Amino acid sequence: MIKKKFRNICLVSVLGIAAFAGVCSYDAGAGSNIHIINVSYDPTRELYESYNEIFQEHWKEKTGQDVDVIQSHGGSGKQALEVINGLQADVVTLALDYDIDAIENAGMIQSGWKEELPDDSAPYTSTIVFLVRKGNPKNIQDWDDLIRDDVDVITPNPKTSGGARWNYLAAWAYAQKIYNNDEEKMEAFIKKLYQNVLVLDSGARSATTSFVENGQGDVLIAWENEAFLSVKDDPDEFEIIAPS
């Protein structure tokens, strides 16, 4: 599935159900089978496993075609780079418009993609929360707790993960508020936070694996939907803290 020549890529920004509308660009006749590849970011696996079934029924009713949706998941920035370097994609559903802009700047998407769909082509959202172990043994309540010497943090790498960049921005916004835009203090806060990070995984799901399955760290900075999934799977092991 590695090609240097692309079809037109259909895409949306921050998280993208509506991206599938772009499959209409195919010329396959009614009754034929088609395949589309959705290159997405880390924590959307379960979403698209469910959504693809709904879409397949919708597309069959609308066109008579059977459609097979192939998924590719990883850190958002890494996925964008993979597409730029040759990974075939019919749809991209990434965590940041920055990552999709990079694909556009590489000449693979026509300009104006944000205007193609409502809400700047970002049909759903999440927020950033803390996932802690049941009972919150370190009493972690807010961002300032993450710079304590006794707290080990898990968060993915901002160089490869869209979720990690949102984590970084959320921490920066907190520091901006409590330090009244004093950039020297803000930078010191961020530096200390990342000094407490045990491992910078490449994506949000691998960071969740480090915290949930490997037992690393006292707190995971995560998408809320990713944290909800962990609590759903292991309600006696984890709980969610919503920081300021």
Short names for language-model regions:
Residues I70-S72, I154, L200, I241:
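General small-molecule cofactor/ligand-binding pocket signal
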Residues E104-K177:
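A conserved helix-loop-strand patch within extracytoplasmic ligand-binding domains
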Residues I34-N38, E82-V83, L117, V153-S161, ...:
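Second-shell loop/turn segments in exported
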